[in-house]
Regions:
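Non-catalytic terminal extensions of PLP-dependent enzymes
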Residues: 92-98, 105-107, 114, 122-125, ...
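Generic recognition of flexible, low-complexity loop/linker segments
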Residues: 13-15, 28-30, 68-71, 115-119, ...
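Short secondary-structure transition/capping segments
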Residues: 34-49, 74-75, 161-170, 196
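Short C-terminal domain-edge/linker segments immediately following a structured domain
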Residues: 55-59, 71-75, 159-162, 193-195
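Structured loops at beta-to-helix junctions and adjacent beta-edge loops in soluble globular domains
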Residues: 28-30, 44-47, 85, 131-133, ...
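Structural motif of enzymes handling amino- and sulfur-group chemistry
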Residues: 32-33, 38-43, 61-129, 158
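Conserved PLP-enzyme active-site core in the AAT-like
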Residues: 1-70
Length: 196
């Protein structure tokens, strides 16, 4: 998302080879690349750095074994499907997806900020973490899980986060999330925690 957010005019701190000391960049291509799981991309700052990735086994019973990756030989179908997904999306598709995700994230962030007892941690773009100083945030997580929201609990500080994806940009999803989250807060405030 970061390169597309930058192209869309969002203020993004440098994160790539423009930063001194960055020697490689890896990206899983399934979540925001819209490819099948099982593919990733790794970029090296130079060819000299890439040579350290090669895997060699000199004691293999079949003879000398060399591979560009530790995983060895793999079917090409995953790579082909990743390539097809990226070609299909194109720059225009990725920009549009990023725009939708970032706009949805802003709406969700604003909605969370309007709920008493919750506050946003940091200044997120699309991975939004929220916490509470007055109620048990993990009970909020439990309530939201029962409503079929896929959120993650964090600690230090105790918080919950949602990673906004293209699925969240569909009509009505933002409103449903904020409604369920509001109900979760009301429930936790009214219903005492079970002992045990």
């Amino acid at each position: 998302i970061l390169p597309w957010a930058e192209k869309l005019g969002y203020k993004i701190s440098p994160f790539d080879f423009r930063v001194p000391g960055v020697t490689s960049i890896s990206a899983d291509t399934h979540k925001y690349g819209y490819a099948s799981k099982g593919t990733s991309v790794i970029l090296y700052h130079s060819k000299a750095l890439r040579r350290y990735q090669y895997f060699t086994a000199t004691d293999w019973p079949g003879g000398l074994y060399l591979s560009p990756t530790f995983a060895g030989s793999r079917p090409g179908a995953l790579s082909a499907s990743c390539w097809a997904a990226m070609i299909s999306m194109g720059e225009k598709g990725y920009l549009e997806s990023a725009r939708k995700i970032l706009e949805t994230a802003k709406k969700i962030k604003n909605g969370i900020e309007e709920i008493d007892d919750l506050h946003i941690l940091g200044d997120p773009l699309w991975v939004i973490s929220f916490a509470s100083n007055s109620i048990d945030i993990y009970r909020i997580l439990d309530f939201m899980s029962k409503r079929k929201w896929n959120l993650n609990g964090l600690h230090k500080p105790a918080s919950v986060h949602i990673c906004i994806t293209l699925r969240h940009t569909q009509p009505g999803v933002t409103e449903k999330f904020i409604s369920d989250l509001t109900q979760a807060v009301d429930h936790v405030k009214k219903v005492p925690a079970e002992k045990g």
